């Protein structure tokens, strides 16, 4: 079956594949757009699997405060170009929505399956490298900060009765933590020997 330039365009828009790949797929599938899209997806997933061991040193943090919890999700990729891609950012926000609505506290299969289509269309290795949930207990205030690089972030939870004052202080602590990368992030983690050295 013959296919037209409009068919190639429709397949490109549906799959994100290149023009030549779309033409080859349509030729292999006798002009059937649905079959060609399936073929391109299969080929794309196979190619994505080959990229799976490539380093993902770039990426973006997604942090949100919902109720008495602060949710953190880290989505990594190979290049900063992709980390700033609108589809990549939208996917991270959608993953955070799913994390919150389903009560996930760690990386789940659903997170990884949500990545598949974007891996195929963008052609980079990507990973959900972190999902964390920080509880904000009653009487405490939580705050967070994401630096302009979108990869560095911090969360601080502080007990206190003056909500406005504590919130400002917690946010200031977040800024300080992001800037100076402290050795310890919780009072209980600090060894007695280190405390003694500081006196």
Give short role names for the model-derived ranges.
Residues 2-199:
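N-terminal assembly/interaction segments in proteins that build large macromolecular machines
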């Amino acid at each position: 079956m013959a296919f037209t330039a409009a068919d190639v365009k429709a397949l490109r828009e549906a799959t994100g594949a290149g023009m030549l790949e779309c033409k080859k797929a349509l030729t292999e599938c006798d002009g059937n757009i649905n079959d060609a899209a399936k073929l391109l997806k299969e080929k794309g997933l196979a190619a994505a699997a080959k990229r799976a061991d490539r380093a993902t040193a770039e990426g973006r943090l997604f942090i949100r405060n919902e109720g008495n919890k602060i949710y953190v999700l880290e989505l990594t990729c190979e290049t900063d170009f992709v980390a700033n891609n609108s589809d990549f950012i939208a996917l991270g926000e959608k993953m955070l929505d799913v994390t919150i609505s389903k009560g996930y506290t760690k990386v789940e299969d659903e997170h990884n399956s949500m990545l598949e289509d974007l891996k195929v269309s963008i052609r980079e290795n990507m990973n959900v490298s972190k999902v964390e949930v920080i509880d904000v207990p009653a009487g405490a205030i939580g705050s967070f900060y994401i630096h302009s690089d979108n990869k560095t972030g911090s969360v601080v939870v502080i007990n206190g009765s003056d909500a406005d004052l504590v919130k400002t202080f917690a946010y200031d602590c977040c800024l300080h933590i992001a800037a100076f990368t402290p050795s310890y992030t919780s009072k209980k983690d600090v060894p007695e020997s280190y405390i003694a050295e500081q006196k």
